[in-house]
């Protein structure tokens, strides 16, 4: 139940205000998972590989609308279909998120045109497994991969 709204800066200030976010994982037919590299200028986890799409749900916005908006803003995807993977609570030293996670196989129209993403590429399960725990990925991606994606997508 939503009980109010807060600025992104408040949510990421260490206040641990629980806030909703969407994640979209994009797979291709070869079972490769598309990840995006966060810019070095990001406050949280700069330069690390992360979920293809991730972003805050705006106050009054529904999950589906947020997913479509964030996918377009970050990787240029629009009018795609997505299946729910699940929801989970993520907590770090500075934030607490309710994550709504989805997967899409509509990968052909990925078009990076955002200052939110440095680069993107498809990763095999083996490549992901070899890099877990080495500081290559964001902690949130690693948690989601181990608890949700590993057994459901690969």
Which residues does each PLM region occupy?
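Short hydrophobic alpha-helix segments
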Residues: 5-6, 37, 88
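A glycine-rich, hydrophobic loop/mini-helix early in the fold
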Residues: 21-53
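The catalytic Nudix box helix
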Residues: 34-35, 52-84
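Nudix hydrolase/Nudix homology domain
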Residues: 47, 59, 84-88, 93-105, ...
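Acidic, metal-coordinating catalytic segment for phosphate/diphosphate chemistry
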Residues: 1-23, 27-29
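A short local loop/turn or secondary-structure capping micro-motif enriched for an aromatic residue
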Residues: 11-14, 41-45, 120-121
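Recognition helices and adjacent regulatory flanks at domain boundaries
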Residues: 42, 69-70, 100
């Amino acid at each position: 139940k939503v009980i109010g709204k807060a600025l992104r800066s408040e949510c990421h200030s260490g206040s641990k205000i629980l806030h909703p976010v969407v994640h979209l994982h994009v797979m291709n037919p070869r079972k490769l998972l598309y990840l995006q590299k966060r810019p070095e200028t990001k406050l949280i986890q700069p330069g690390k590989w992360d979920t293809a799409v991730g972003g805050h749900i705006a106050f009054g916005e529904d999950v589906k609308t947020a997913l479509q908006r964030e996918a377009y803003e970050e990787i240029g995807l629009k009018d795609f279909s997505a299946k729910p993977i699940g929801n989970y609570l993520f907590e770090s030293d500075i934030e607490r998120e309710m994550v709504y996670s989805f997967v899409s196989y509509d990968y052909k129209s990925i078009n990076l045109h955002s200052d939110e993403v440095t680069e993107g590429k498809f990763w095999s399960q083996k490549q992901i497994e070899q890099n877990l725990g080495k500081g290559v990925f964001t902690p949130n991606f690693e948690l989601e991969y181990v608890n949700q994606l590993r057994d459901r997508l690969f």
